[in-house]
């Protein structure tokens, strides 16, 4: 009891500190809105939108009761071919049958979905006339289910209507959606907590997505028992996604420095910039990653480590789902989208694949060296959490210290030696930069603006890590 009380006090102190200081922890700023919304060029407020989440070993068995309570009569269960034969999906179906819930299974979800795979799932959802959705799988499955729910609830909309600008029209979601329950089986995306759905837009060979609080799951069931089936490299790459979600959201441009100021609350973006509440979740997720990720990768039977990483994924999701991510993710989308022949170990797919978490983390040393010029104290703080000795470090040391800490972390976990190791060369940099430019939804949240030349230099620096 005393330990729990101490933990609460510690978190409250973190919140108090974050609310009183700017992201560099050295200059105070006012929380007052100042001018009216119509008169400001930058935002003055932030929102926290989070799915209801339930955590516990075996909690998946409750899903049938949840859908019964929601009044669901016809449920769309989405998963992928591999997972459809594994215990998580069987546990879900047993619960649905036990509670008299009618359902149809869609198991054609693509790992790293595309606009084509999204539209196939959407068509299935439209024909099924479902009154609730249930996603069992990793981020690809949950994101596909979000899209199916959205477009089947808005059947006359064009696919690009809700896709993020500049690739799509980025229209706000105003139609009511059906309940969606997410049962994550990996520990990385945090998609069970966020209003974001990511996919490859095949025409341009880039990743983009849909971002709206309206599409976040109604309920996320976080069951650590599902993590025990994950292969080593899936655990690793999922964990790298958690790592970068937390690092990027904590070092993102502060919400009150983001522009433009929205003319209405409905136009305030899902990704709003770092803020005092997201900061707490990001820091806590980083501490869990530092303590448990290596254990979770190396020992598949370590339920404590894998359970904590499952929680860290949700914690980081709460943080970045409202604060946002920036350059690591913005640059990762063309890295995944332009993949040539690389096939990651432990992924049972029939197409070339750079897992999302790997594509994100390979640029992290270069990115945080670049961004450390803004808010260096934050960069030193996260380096210390990850194991660096920062007692004699100065502000100008922040970038190199964090970059070296990340390189050591990745080397210890047998991560590929940079972009060159997954099939890229300097000749590919112009296309990688071209694929990053449309990702302004996230790249504009970097604390430091970047030119095309800057992006080229970051990709070049990421060709080799060690």
UniProtKB/Swiss-Prot annotation:
Under the heading Gene3D superfamilies, the entry gives: 3.40.50.1970, Dehydroquinate synthase-like - alpha domain
Using the record's annotations, give every residue carrying the modification Phosphoserine: 451
Which species? Bos taurus (Bovine)
List the Gene Ontology MF annotations in alphabetical order. Answer: alcohol dehydrogenase (NAD+) activity; hydroxyacid-oxoacid transhydrogenase activity; metal ion binding
Known PANTHER family for this protein?
Answer: ALCOHOL DEHYDROGENASE, HYDROXYACID-OXOACID TRANSHYDROGENASE, MITOCHONDRIAL
Question: Chief location of this protein?
Answer: mitochondrion
Task: Give the reaction(s) catalysed.
Answer: (S)-3-hydroxybutanoate + 2-oxoglutarate = (R)-2-hydroxyglutarate + acetoacetate; 4-hydroxybutanoate + 2-oxoglutarate = (R)-2-hydroxyglutarate + succinate semialdehyde
What do the Gene Ontology cellular component annotations say? mitochondrion
Q: What is the lineage of its organism?
A: Eukaryota, Metazoa, Chordata, Craniata, Vertebrata
Function according to Swiss-Prot or TrEMBL: Catalyzes the cofactor-independent reversible oxidation of gamma-hydroxybutyrate (GHB) to succinic semialdehyde (SSA) coupled to reduction of 2-ketoglutarate (2-KG) to D-2-hydroxyglutarate (D-2-HG). L-3-hydroxybutyrate (L-3-OHB) is also a substrate for HOT when using 2-KG as hydrogen acceptor, resulting in the formation of D-2-HG.
Q: Which positions does the record annotate as the modified residue N6-acetyllysine?
A: 444
Q: Which CDD domains match?
A: HOT (cd08190)
Q: Which family does it belong to?
A: Belongs to the iron-containing alcohol dehydrogenase family. Hydroxyacid-oxoacid transhydrogenase subfamily.
Protein's name according to its UniProt entry: Hydroxyacid-oxoacid transhydrogenase, mitochondrial
Q: Does the keyword Transmembrane apply?
A: no
Q: Which gene encodes it?
A: ADHFE1
What EC number(s) would the UniProt record show? 1.1.99.24
Query: Which UniProt keywords are given for this protein, alphabetically ordered?
Result: Acetylation, Lipid metabolism, Mitochondrion, Oxidoreductase, Phosphoprotein, Transit peptide
Q: Which GO terms describe its biological process?
A: glutamate catabolic process via 2-hydroxyglutarate; lipid metabolic process
- Identify the Pfam families for this entry: ADH_Fe_C, Fe-ADH
Cellular location(s): Mitochondrion
